[in-house]
Amino acid sequence: MTTNAPAGSSAAAGSSRRLQQTQNQVDEVVDIMRVNVDKVLERDQKLSELDDRADALQAGASQFETSAAKLKRKYWWKNCKMWAIGITVVVIIIIIIVVWSISS
């Protein structure tokens, strides 16, 4: 029995050592997973902020498009008015020339 006691003791020590190694590995994996979860949460927050910025940019682009269309329409009408004024002036000048040439 004396010979079995040290063998049992060394087997228990080896088992304890393996258990400790396994526990250390588990602790290491748990730490890595905590870091990964933190990174995922940070990524989620950044994606959420990016999504908010994209929504704001889309709203700004839509507003810009509307304003640009209104401005285009405004200047198109201004251009039409200028053409109408120019044509009217030319017609009046032609009428004056014709009336002046007939009356002379």
UniProtKB/Swiss-Prot annotation:
Residues 1-23 are annotated as: Disordered. Ubiquitinated by RNF167 at Lys-70, Lys-72 and Lys-81, regulating the recycling endosome pathway. Pfam families: Synaptobrevin (PF00957). It is found in: Early endosome membrane; Recycling endosome membrane; Synapse, Synaptosome. One of its GO terms (biological process) is vesicle-mediated transport. Keywords: Coiled coil, Endosome, Isopeptide bond, Membrane, Protein transport, Synapse, Synaptosome, Transmembrane, Transmembrane helix, Transport, Ubl conjugation. InterPro entries: Synaptobrevin-like (IPR001388), Synaptobrevin/VAMP (IPR016444), V_SNARE_CC (IPR042855). The chain crosses the membrane at residues 82-102. Residues 18-78 form the v-SNARE coiled-coil homology domain. The keyword Nucleotide-binding does not apply. GO terms for cellular component: cytosol; early endosome membrane; neuron projection; plasma membrane; recycling endosome membrane; SNARE complex; synapse. It is a single-pass type IV membrane protein. GO terms for molecular function: SNAP receptor activity; syntaxin-1 binding. There is a cross-link at K70, K72, K81 (Glycyl lysine isopeptide (Lys-Gly) (interchain with G-Cter in ubiquitin)). Residues 1-81 are cytoplasmic. Residues 103-104 are vesicular. Residues 7-16 have a biased composition (Low complexity). Interacts with POPDC1 (via the C-terminus cytoplasmic tail). Interacts with BCAP31; involved in VAMP3 export from the endoplasmic reticulum. Interacts with BAIAP3; this interaction is increased in the presence of calcium. Interacts with PICALM. Belongs to the synaptobrevin family. SNARE involved in vesicular transport from the late endosomes to the trans-Golgi network. This is Vesicle-associated membrane protein 3. It comes from Bos taurus (Bovine). The lineage of its organism: Eukaryota, Metazoa, Chordata, Craniata, Vertebrata.
